[in-house]
């Protein structure tokens, strides 16, 4: 009977990415091939866009942020990374993610970080809605997506995949993709540190991206849609 319970626990860990009260997680599954890594960082950032350079205790990860397709989610990530969005864990202008741990790692599945408590239970003191785009799927290694505890409960926690995880589509908001450093993602172990996040803006549109406005507009749009749905049900 103990064997059955252990099996069920392992399966539930594999098929969900949550901001959970359980700090002890199961590590399992295979390794990714190194050919998913692109090694020339200069070439990777020649394309206009918003990039996040995540410095870790294992090396650097560079991510292209999908600010045009998921502006609210990207704005939240940048706002926290640069200390622009008010939260109850860090003071104004203090980078939120610097010094936090990757508190949950499941081999051949994903690495998860962004919890200010280092346990998977923390958040920035607010929640914001899901933001799904039909072109953004968990269809490859190196997908950057939001961890949550249910619909519309996004905060600061995020994960990066080791492989495609299609069962997470339309449950977790994808907002970026690794363009360099997938080998670093694969090396990250539980309790390794995220040392800093540097946001790099390439091109006019990226430089004009307004973090606070994009975050506020996304929430307003969600509230508007909710009111319209409620009204439709009443009619």
Regions found by a protein language model. Give the residues of each.
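Cyclophilin-like peptidyl-prolyl cis-trans isomerases
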Residues: 17-235
């Amino acid at each position: 009977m103990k064997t059955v319970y252990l099996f069920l626990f392992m399966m539930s860990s594999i098929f969900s990415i949550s901001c959970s009260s359980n700090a002890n997680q199961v590590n399992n599954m295979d390794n990714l091939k190194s050919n998913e890594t692109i090694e020339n960082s200069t070439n990777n950032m020649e394309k206009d866009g918003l990039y996040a350079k995540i410095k870790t205790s294992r090396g650097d990860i560079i991510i292209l942020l999908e600010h045009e397709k998921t502006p609210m989610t990207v704005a939240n990530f940048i706002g926290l990374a640069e200390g622009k969005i008010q939260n109850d864990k860090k003071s104004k202008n203090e980078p939120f993610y610097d010094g936090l741990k990757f508190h949950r790692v499941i081999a051949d599945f994903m690495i998860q970080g962004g919890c200010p408590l280092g346990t998977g239970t923390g958040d920035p003191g607010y929640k914001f809605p899901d933001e799904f785009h039909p072109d953004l799927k968990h269809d490859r290694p190196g997908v950057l997506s939001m961890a949550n505890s249910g619909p519309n409960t996004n905060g600061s926690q995020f994960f990066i995949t080791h492989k495609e995880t299609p069962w997470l589509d339309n449950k977790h908001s994808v907002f970026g993709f690794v363009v360099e450093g997938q080998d670093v993602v694969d090396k990250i172990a539980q309790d390794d540190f995220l040392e800093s996040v540097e946001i790099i803006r390439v091109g006019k549109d990226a430089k004009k991206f307004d973090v606070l406005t994009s975050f506020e507009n996304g929430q307003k749009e969600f509230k508007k849609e909710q009111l319209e749905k409620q009204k439709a049900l009443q009619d």
